[in-house]
Amino acid sequence: MAARLCCQLDSSRDVVLLRPFGSESGGPAVSRPSAGSASRADSPLPSAAESHLPLGRLPACFASPSGPCCLGFTCAEFGAMVSTMNFVTWHAKRQLGMPTKDLWTPYVRNQLLTKWEEGTIDSRLPLFVLGGCRHKYM
């Protein structure tokens, strides 16, 4: 089972907002490490924010302290949702040395990572978090 979450960068507070795709309400804020820091938080979702998260269509493991069982990231434009690109599959193949389309490297570097570090991610190019697991929806 999978749930789609839209991740939006709030550069004024230096946080990433997670919310179910199609929902108008803001989701819980997750702190973003600075560009020079490689450390990560233990939990992708602060426990204090769990009560404010609309849990419809999310897997049961999403609100657990250890996070969802499996996360996948895709990218898409709001105007062309049919053309999502699976970042996890591409990255896994690259790590194994398998041939991949070389279009991904400049796309990820120029469109996502550079803009993320600069805090200028275009609202038309969001990242979506796909939580896939064997748990039932809440």
Curated annotation (Swiss-Prot):
It comes from the Viruses. A fraction may be phosphorylated in insect cells and HepG2 cells, a human hepatoblastoma cell line. Phosphorylated in vitro by host protein kinase C or mitogen-activated protein kinase. N-acetylated in insect cells. One of its GO terms (biological process) is symbiont-mediated activation of host NF-kappaB cascade. It is found in: Host cytoplasm; Host nucleus; Host mitochondrion. GO terms for cellular component: host cell mitochondrion; host cell nucleus. The keyword Transit peptide does not apply. Keywords: Activation of host NF-kappa-B by virus, Activator, Apoptosis, Host cytoplasm, Host G2/M cell cycle arrest by virus, Host mitochondrion, Host nucleus, Host-virus interaction, Modulation of host cell cycle by virus, Transcription, Transcription regulation. The keyword Ligase does not apply. Belongs to the orthohepadnavirus protein X family. May form homodimer. May interact with host CEBPA, CFLAR, CREB1, DDB1, E4F1, HBXIP, HSPD1/HSP60, NFKBIA, POLR2E and SMAD4. Interacts with host SMC5-SMC6 complex and induces its degradation. Interacts with host TRPC4AP; leading to prevent ubiquitination of TRPC4AP. Interacts with host PLSCR1; this interaction promotes ubiquitination and degradation of HBx and impairs HBx-mediated cell proliferation. This is Protein X.
